[in-house]
Amino acid sequence: DASPEWVHRHIEQLKPVLQRNSDVVLCLQAGFIGVWGEWAFTDHFVRGPKTPEEHALRKEVMIALLDALPQNRQIALRTPMFKKRMFLDSYDDTLTLATAHNGSDMSRICAHNDCFGADASDMGTFTEAGAREFWQQETKYVMMGGETCQISRYCKCEPSLKDMEDYHWTYLSGPSNISDRWETDGCYDEILRRLGYRLIITDMHHTPKPQAGESFRMVLELRN
């Protein structure tokens, strides 16, 4: 991976592009550090960090990314541990209805799991007590997405549907052998239907004969 200096230079180069095109950015996975940009197996950042001090270089990258995007866009971290070690005192410090969607850095840090259903810990995604519960609470208010990476008993239909509901998944990609398994086992259509937002207009009322220069009133009833 690139050195911290080069990572920050890359982010500065991307900042005007991200700002200019933020309207088509769902969220931004933090990336930049380690193999696959998943913040592990790094040559230039501390490998296997445990303390806030060992996370300091990563935190600087995260702060730069938060600055590179407008306040109404979120940055996704690969594991719940990273948010805790860089910004929080414990896994109990979750977002709430009162602290979500207020433009603060904490309200803009979301989640991505790039080994959904791969094994008991999702290949190191959940390695600490409280980590799962933390993301289950946080993702009520921030994006949750990622990808699958290998076949296991944890990506069968029943556990997959439960995890997607528990963690409020919005988007998912990954190898086709897993989606093929879901299709064979009969849950693919439900997963496809429930991912993300499907806003449907159930009723609509508007000013019947609007005139140029006059106010126009519309009432929409939407269902997700």
Annotate each PLM feature.
Residues W6-R9, Q13, L57-E60, A64, ...:
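Extracytoplasmic/secreted proteins, especially bacterial periplasmic and envelope-associated proteins
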Residues R20, C27-E38, T42-I178:
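Catalytic-core regions of glycoside hydrolase
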Residues C155-P208:
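Catalytic cores of secreted or luminal carbohydrate-active enzymes
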Residues E214-M218:
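Structural beta-strand segments of beta-rich domains
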